[in-house]
Each structure stands twice: as structure tokens, then as C-alpha cells.
UniProtKB/Swiss-Prot annotation:
Pathway: Alkaloid biosynthesis
UniProt entry keywords in alphabetical sequence: Alkaloid metabolism, Prenyltransferase, Transferase
Species, as recorded: Penicillium fellutanum
Originating gene: phqJ
CDD domains associated with the record: PT-DMATS_CymD
Annotated brevianamide F binding sites: E99, Y204
Full protein name: Prenyltransferase phqJ
Length: 406
């Protein structure tokens, strides 16, 4: 479940914020913070209260909440750039550089995730037209934070094949993709598990495809050829590549993700996105064009996916946007598909109700029973906030997988 970071009230709704107490941990930390500029203070006051409420609702202990809010202030707040944002990030519909989400799995503590694309005052300027200077500065900062198991070597291996070189950047002269205002090349995701932080990287090769004239699949193969453990994906990668090309699923929205850990242990994720997607196409995507129809794991996952689709899209066979990824594990025999139901701009109460029904369906009854009240508190901390009047909290909802993620 993904939640927005800044509220935008629907047309006709009151824009007056209800009176409510700020989260205690957030308030205590804020008193001791010394911001370098007004932008940092604004990013903190507009985003940190929501993160604080999400951490609390997900069952994080008070020390953990303090730890991760402090990390948020140290690592991300100084690297969101000017406020209001000038650099348009690809990670959110609105172009904001940050997004919060919660991952629920049976038998496990919920995991809060922070997706962000670093930005700065030079992002998009002649000094950093495609934001890579800023991204690399933040990568170096994460290296100095000594996250357990953090290893940026795979980032450095793949970046030259999937992102613009200095010469290519100069050649494009700040140009964007056709029909888009986004120029993102890299972004990060942080999984907050227990007391630990796991870093994920996302690379967006569309601009590299534009300037090189090479297809996404060609760039990906060239990048993985430099990966010392590329043979670990030798069985499963051809399945994904052949379907994505056959199904005409590679486009300017395609990107890749991987874990910033020892490269022999890192997952590889290949993302696709299509506009105006039907349930029939979702089935095709899930089974890689019938390549996995005999897989029991794939069949079980598709049944979950159909249930989620029905709860979030009752009576409809099409949605405006479809986003998915194929997760490739080292040495795996088949990819694990994950599909994200894009709920941007839809009624918050109907979305929350659909998710609640799905959680009941998969046996997360306790989580389901308290979910709507928790979501209501996300908006300014009001327990009974009228979600039927808002369309701001949800972006994407992914399916529960038949097995737990590693």
C-alpha cells in the first residue's frame, strides 16, 4: 500500500486542516533540529508527520521510530531540493521526490518503505541536467552511513550501460522524453526492517535508449554482461526478454531495479508499464504469454491477483494504467511477477475498503480490521477523517504473493 506525501484536496472539498496533535516522536525531534534552509524545514513539516504516523501504525517501537525519522532527516530531507519542488521525479504521479509505502505479509511485521529520488538546486540545470550528480552524491552519503550489508558495486557496474554518459548528456542538451516532463535516470528505495535498512536502486534507461538508438533489451543485456554473476540469471532472463519483446511491453516507461547488496545475492527486477490495460492483458503479463501456465506458483499468484483486481476494480475489466515487475532471483528457474494496481486519483474510502476486503481474503484479519482507522489518521492525525471526500492517499497497490519475499 502506497501513500502520498502531500495532500491535495479534491475540488469542492474544504482545504482547512482539522485541528489535531502532531505525532509525539515527530514533535520531540523537531524541537532539536537545526535546518540549513527554509526548504529543508518545509520538506520536514510537510512529510515527516506522515512518516511518523505510518511507522507507528506499522508497529515500529519508539526507538525504531526515532531511529528512522532521524535517518529521514539526515539522509533525505537535505536532498529533496527546493520547496516547492522544481525537479519532476518519475517516482510519483505529482513529480514529488518521495513516496511512502507499507508492505504487509502473513506472519511478518509490516515493512515501511521510503522511495525517493534525490534532488538539489542544480537538478535540471546546466550543471546537472539529468540529476546524476545529485544522485551520485547521495549514493556516496549512503556508503558513509554504514548500512549493514550495503554494497553499491552493482550500481557502479550497471550505471554506465543504463544511464547517460557526460557526452550523451551534453548531446541531449536537457531534452525530455516525448510526451513526458520526466528526466529521471535513477532513484532509491529504503526498506526499514527491524533496526536495519536495505537499499534498492532503480535505473530508468529511456534517455539512454533515445540517444544511443538501442532498444531497452539490448541495453539490459549489455549491462548484465558486465555483471560478474550474470550467469545466475541465465535461465530466467531469456523468458522475460522474449515475452516483453513479443508482447510489445518494453517502452519509455520500462526500468530495472536491484538490491544494493553483494551482487551474488541481489535480486534483479524488470519493470513494465502500459496504458489502458485489460484483465486479459494482466493474465498474459502474469504468465509471460503462457510461458508459465504450468507453474503452480504462478497459478496461485494469479488467483491472488484476480481477487485483488475484483476488490479494487469491481465489475471492471480495464484500468487506465498497469505497472508490473518480474523479480529474478539468482539461480531461479522462473521469474516471480508482481502487478501494481494504480489507484491514483480514485476515492480514498473505496480504495481503503477494497484493500481491507483483500486483507481479509488472504487471512490478515487483524490488519484488515484496523486498516481504515489507521488510514484515516494519516490525514492530519484525525481518527475519523472522511476518506470519502479525498483522493490523495493511494498510488499503487500490489498483490500479496503466494510466498514471502526474500
Amino acid at each position: 500500500m502506497t501513500v502520498s506525501t502531500e495532500s491535495n484536496f479534491p475540488h469542492g472539498a474544504s482545504t482547512q486542516k482539522p485541528q489535531s496533535a502532531e505525532p509525539e516522536i515527530y514533535s520531540s525531534l523537531t524541537k532539536s533540529l537545526d535546518f540549513s534552509n527554509d526548504a529543508e524545514e518545509k520538506w520536514w513539516t510537510r512529510t515527516a508527520p506522515l512518516l511518523s504516523r505510518i511507522l507507528d501504525s506499522a508497529g515500529y517501537t519508539l526507538p525504531q521510530q526515532c531511529q528512522f525519522l532521524t535517518l529521514f532527516n539526515t539522509l533525505m530531507i537535505p536532498n529533496f531540493g527546493p520547496h516547492p519542488h522544481i525537479w519532476h521525479s518519475s517516482i510519483t504521479h505529482s513529480g514529488l521526490p518521495v513516496e511512502f509505502s507499507v508492505n504487509y505479509q502473513p506472519g511478518k511485521q509490516p515493512t515501511v518503505r521510503i522511495g525517493f529520488e534525490p534532488a538539489s538546486s542544480i537538478s535540471g540545470t546546466a550543471r546537472d541536467p539529468y540529476n546524476m550528480v545529485t544522485v551520485l552524491n547521495v549514493l556516496n552519503k549512503m556508503s558513509r552511513l554504514n548500512f549493514k550489508g550495503f554494497d553499491p558495486s552493482l550500481f557502479h557496474t550497471l550505471i554506465s550501460s543504463l544511464a547517460l554518459s557526460k557526452n550523451e548528456s551534453d548531446l541531449l542538451q536537457g531534452a525530455k522524453l516525448e510526451g513526458s516532463k520526466f528526466k529521471t535516470q535513477a532513484a532509491f528505495g529504503l526498506d526499514l526492517k527491524g533496526d536495519a535498512v536495505t537499499v534498492k536502486t532503480y535505473l530508468y534507461p529511456a534517455l539512454k535508449c533515445k540517444v544511443s538508438g538501442l532498444a531497452f533489451s539490448e541495453l539490459l543485456e549489455a549491462a548484465l554482461a558486465k555483471h560478474q554473476n550474470a550467469h545466475d540469471f541465465s535461465r530466467v532472463l531469456p523468458l522475460v526478454q522474449s515475452y516483453m519483446e513479443e508482447g510489445q511491453c518494453y517502452n519509455q516507461y520500462s526500468f530495472v531495479g536491484f538490491d544494493c547488496v553483494d551482487s551474488s545475492k541481489s535480486r534483479l527486477k524488470i519493470y513494465g508499464a502500459l496504458l489502458d490495460i485489460s484483465w486479459k492483458k494482466v493474465e498474459e503479463v502474469w504468465t509471460l504469454g503462457a510461458r508459465l501456465v504450468n507453474s503452480e506458483t504462478n497459478k496461485e499468484g494469479l488467483r491472488y491477483m484476480r481477487a485483488l483486481w475484483e476488490y479494487l476494480t469491481p465489475g471492471k475489466e480495464r484500468r487506465p494504467v498497469g505497472i508490473w515487475n518480474y523479480e529474478l532471483l539468482p539461480g531461479s528457474e522462473e521469474p516471480m511477477p508482481k502487478f501494481y494496481v494504480d489507484m491514483n486519483g480514485e476515492n480514498d474510502f473505496q480504495n481503503a475498503l477494497g484493500i481491507t476486503k483483500f486483507l481479509h481474503h488472504i487471512g490478515l484479519t487483524t490488519t484488515a480490521e484496523g486498516l481504515i482507522s489507521k488510514i484515516q489518521e494519516y490525514l492530519y492525525g484525525v481518527p475519523h477523517y472522511p476518506l470519502s471526500q479525498t483522493h490523495v492517499l493511494f498510488a499503487n497497490q500490489g498483490p500479496m504473493q503466494p510466498r514471502c519475499e526474500p
